[in-house]
Amino acid sequence: LCNDLSNLLNRTISMVNKYFNGKVPKYNGTPNEVDKELEKYTIEQIEKFEDLMEEYEISNALQEIWNIITRTNKYIDVTAPWILAKQEETEKLESVIYHLVENLRKIAILIRPFMNETSNNILRQLGIELKEKNVWQTLKENNKQEEIKVIEKGEPIFMRLNMQEEIEYIKGKMG
């Protein structure tokens, strides 16, 4: 959780602040191939998630969410937003940042039934309010929200554990 989801959120918020002064770029409707691939993959995983939930295969459904998280982290590495910024490829950079925020919005909605507080925390940090009565309907489309402003400094949604402290704590409880 800490390495994947929390890191994805913090990296995204950091880039929105660094490259766009905290304002999420609007969707321009013309994604490049890498963006299209991410969109397609995300929708496929959401559909698998829905099918698995209907069959009460909760752990497998949760794995589909983590597949989206993993793929979105990989998307950062593939698109290299820091290079796009350095090369002043603003339109591509806007699309990358938009897609990162959009996938985090979808992830927050997907984890909501299992981790409601974490979902709310992610959405709050992204500056997103869920106004729709049925947010599930927005999962398979790009949400064209008006201006979104993220918080200035991302907050960890999960804290790293100190293994030695945890071992000592457990030993102390065991007597």
Model region roles, listed by residue range:
Residues 51, 55-57, 66-175:
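Basic, alpha-helical terminal appendages of large translation-related enzymes
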Residues 1-92:
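Long, charged, mostly alpha-helical binding arms that flank functional sites
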